[in-house]
Amino acid sequence: MLFFISCSNSDSPVAPVDPVVPQPNRAVNLTHFNNLYKEIDFKGKKAGFIYIYSNYPTYEPVTSIEESGITCVDDVARAIIVLSEYIKVYGSDADSLDKIKKYTEFILAMQNENGYFNNFIYADYSINTTYVTSVANLNWWSLRALVGLETAYPLLKSDADITNRISQSVTKLLSNIKRDLPMTSLTTETVNGIEMPTWLPLKYASDQSALLIIGLLKNYERTSNSGDLTMIDALAKGIMIMQKGDATHYPYNAFMSYNNQWHAYGNDQSNALLKAGVALNKQEYIDSALKEVDNFYPKLVQSGYAEEYFIQANGDNFSEISRKKYAQIAYGIRPMVSAAAEAYRYSKNSSHLILAKNIAAWLSGSNDAGQPMYIHETGICFDGIVNAGQVNKNSGAESTIEALLILLEMEKLK
């Protein structure tokens, strides 16, 4: 089963947005992001989290969600990444570092005794251990915890207590991951005529594999653990098998996300392969990623983007079974911006910079709705384009986070 990553899933109608006080003179406005922040006493520590939902017209956080919860590791870990990128662009500040520490305390407290992470907490701050996307297992939220903790570590290095606990937590998590993904038999199988790797998370999940590569890279930078390199290489090889078509044949070097499905959200394969290829001097990773960036991305942008599609094999080629164009969300745009930016850093080719700018322009109105999705005066990013001309103007954590990451990526390219 493939689980959708997002903690949120709202479909509210179109409505105008009310402004709040902006952060002056900066392209990246953290006002709304910070309005979603909550500090609590959690398992004996001062911890912080970011509310999942924030709805039009007030944009006050939604403080009670019965089925799943009010916040999740998936979003808190990404909030750490936002603040780490913000520090890279604008310099370190005490408030950002304090929030990073408290977000980190939240993630550490969400580690289950089995070594993986539960995802949600309820309004009473009890941990949801049973909801399908909150069970402590090898899935998006545990991988996100890895990336969040490794991102926080160097920023908190002056605090020996918390960095020691991060190290212990990550060691336990990676022990689980390497046990459950042994990488000892890299065999493929044919599913509906399409060659698939069988050793990735959830067997075929190249999207989750990309996130794991990013986390393993950060761990390797910190620990020099050779086991990380073995796993990165196996994951990269699996991802490259999931790349289908070529420059002139559909789907134009796109990486399938899971089995025969491509989806926009969290499809960080090119981003991960470029990061790993540059860091580890693996040209095959870089070449594979550039094929998607150069061949698939421009066609997707020209077509007005998509939410997902499914492919089938026709002899040596592929054709499309079905396609959904909407909803379109910041979490579907950000991976492409990240990859195009990484491509530009590697190649110094202006075409990659132009591509990154063109994709990022989705936020400012170059989209099917014909209107901005990010409102600089408020720091709000709308939750998605529902269909041509219709926008869901709620602004939850995920949309806010992913929009800010797009903006920060573009600031780094200046």
Which positions does each model-derived feature cover?
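C-terminal motif of bacterial Sec signal peptides marking the signal peptidase cleavage site
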Residues: F3-S6
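Low-complexity, Ser/Thr/Pro/Gly-enriched N-terminal "stalk/linker" regions
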Residues: N9-R78, V82, Y90-V132, A160-W199, ...
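Non-catalytic carbohydrate-binding regions of carbohydrate-active enzymes
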Residues: R26-K43, L280-N392, K414
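Well-ordered alpha-helical segments within folded domains of soluble proteins
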Residues: I70-K88, I100, V135-P154, P201-Y220, ...
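Extracytoplasmic/secreted proteins, especially bacterial periplasmic and envelope-associated proteins
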Residues: R78-I81, E85, D95, K99-K102, ...
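Amphipathic alpha-helical segments of tetratricopeptide repeats
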Residues: K88, L108-A109, P154, E221, ...
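Short linear capping/connector segments at secondary-structure termini
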Residues: F120-T130, T188-T198, P251-S257, Y309-S319, ...
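Solenoidal tandem-repeat scaffolds enriched in leucines and small polar residues
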Residues: G193-Y285
